[in-house]
Amino acid sequence: VVATPEKLEHNHEQSSGQQRVAVLLMGYGEVESYEDFANYNEQALHLLTAKFAPVPAWIYPPLARILALFDRHEWGHQHNDFISPHNAIFEKQRAGIEKNLQQKWGDRVQVFKAFNFCAPFLPHQVLAEIKNQGFDKLLIYPLLVVDSIFTSGIAIEQVNKALSQLTDGSEHWVKGLRYIPSFYNEAAYIDMMVHLVEEKIASDLAAAYLPAEIGIVLMNHGCPHKAKGFTSGITESQALYDLIRDKLINRYPLISIGWLNHDTPLIEWTQPNVEQAAKNLIQLGAKAVMFMPIGFATENHETLLDVHHIIHALEKKHFQVNYVQMPCVNDHPDFLAMAAQWANPHIADLLSEEATTVNPQLAVAHHHHH
């Protein structure tokens, strides 16, 4: 449930007559019931695959059902009825960020979560709830490291669609809006990535391996090279990797970017993929390989299952190598504190600025004249 009636009443009582901001924290969401695979896949095909793959729309429903069979096999049979922890972790992130924000702003700020593909937290459902609670200022905050058409881009697409459906007459209910597209270059996040790597090496690897024998694969979400002119995420992902690498390379020479790609036919993806990156480091003398997710803030089936598959495949050929799989930042208190910190200036702007009234009826079609 997004909010209980008691909480609703309490909020109105305390906040009447003062400015309030709703923070819309957005993530992908993952299925928790295997029955939902086909529906989830069809939405993902429409919103994600359509941005880069030349696939006609009529093929989405049958393709989604076929993909659901593969998903069920992988999650159910290969991984002992795996249930993704993604949604539960995201809720902890939402609660933790809200707690941090409310220490500064009190009940003037509330954090709502929305999932791109999972009811009952679809953007249109959550925005309807935000409107019902009387909020008129909105901070759109996809909790995604890198900005691309596949992350923050679809968040904005869904929010725009939902807001147009929630418009009443001649005055729009949203009076102020801000947006945080990504945090790939935030110093606090970069330093945290470096610290987590160094900490793990010190506790698990430093006693048995020379620094030059420790391979580090810094994992980003794979990106197709062509995305119909949309921002694909490659530039920010590469910049994120470079910033972290620069802080580690003098002590640990064996570092590589590794892209967690989706193997789709006819589509050129970023290279090297994670498995190839690890093989390259092993070839250069790595006796231990660490897999560190940098382009993912919340654990999901890719960071868990895909990396598990990759390690399993590597173990068959290079059984003498020690493999270390690192978690995402998830609900680490330091991450939740910094994520709240990034929102503070935008919340301050929203609370201090004059309300802007938008009349949707003025947006009539203008013909282009030569």
What is each model feature region?
Residues 2-370:
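Active-site-proximal alpha-helix that buttresses catalytic centers in soluble enzyme cores
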